[in-house]
From Swiss-Prot:
It comes from Acidithiobacillus ferrooxidans (strain ATCC 53993 / BNL-5-31) (Leptospirillum ferrooxidans (ATCC 53993)). The keyword RNA-binding does not apply. A motif (Nudix box) lies at residues 38-59. This is RNA pyrophosphohydrolase. CDD domains: NUDIX_Ap4A_hydrolase_plant_like. GO terms for molecular function: mRNA 5'-diphosphatase activity. It comes from the Bacteria. Residues 6-145 form the Nudix hydrolase domain. GO terms for biological process: mRNA catabolic process. SUPFAM superfamilies: Nudix. Pfam families: NUDIX (PF00293). Belongs to the Nudix hydrolase family. RppH subfamily.
Length: 174
């Protein structure tokens, strides 16, 4: 489902543990890490899509909703990365959810019916902005920045996430 402007409605999920680290997942068969995300089906609310996508991508929906972004955040997908030829397709528009994981780590199961991820780890809250593919960077920055006050996170140590001199690696752990 693509809207009139060429954007596919989607949900993004920032899953926090008790230390406010976030779940960072490695895409299957790629050297790319990201937050879980997925499309919103016809007649589905963003919240319904979020719970369905959690089950499909990380094998559990044992989360509590802390908050969500006020509106849609958009990014354009470079033409070279389009999976199929879609004349109207420009990118994704996303509602982001900040979630508290309430299960045991053993309940995170990436071996789902159609696996999208092959590994995961807990990382510092702001680290994904530095590590995500460049065309998603601003949306990650906006989502993390808008939702950070809900868990009393300090502002990030940089001002513009799209300037390479402001990027710095941060090590994560499981």
């Amino acid at each position: 489902m693509i809207d009139a402007d060429g954007y596919r409605p989607n949900v993004g999920m920032i899953i926090c543990n008790e230390q406010n680290q976030v779940l960072w997942a490695k895409r299957r068969g790629e050297n790319a890490w990201q937050f879980p995300q997925g499309g919103i089906d016809y007649a589905e609310t963003p919240e319904q899509a979020m719970f369905r996508e959690l089950e499909e991508e990380v094998g559990t929906a044992k989360v509590c909703i802390i908050g969500r972004t006020r509106g849609w955040l958009r990014y354009e997908v470079p033409c070279a990365r389009h999976r199929v030829s879609r004349r109207r397709y420009r990118g994704q528009k996303q509602i982001w959810f900040l979630l508290r994981f309430e299960g045991e780590e053993a309940e995170i199961n990436l071996r789902t019916r159609q696996p999208e991820f092959e590994d995961w780890r807990w990382v510092d809250y702001w680290m994904p902005v530095n590590e995500i593919i460049s065309f998603k960077r601003r949306v990650y920055w906006q989502a993390l920045q808008e939702l950070a006050p809900l868990i009393n996170m300090n502002p990030p140590p940089m001002t513009d996430p799209c300037r390479s001199e402001n990027r710095h690696p941060v090590v994560g752990n499981r």
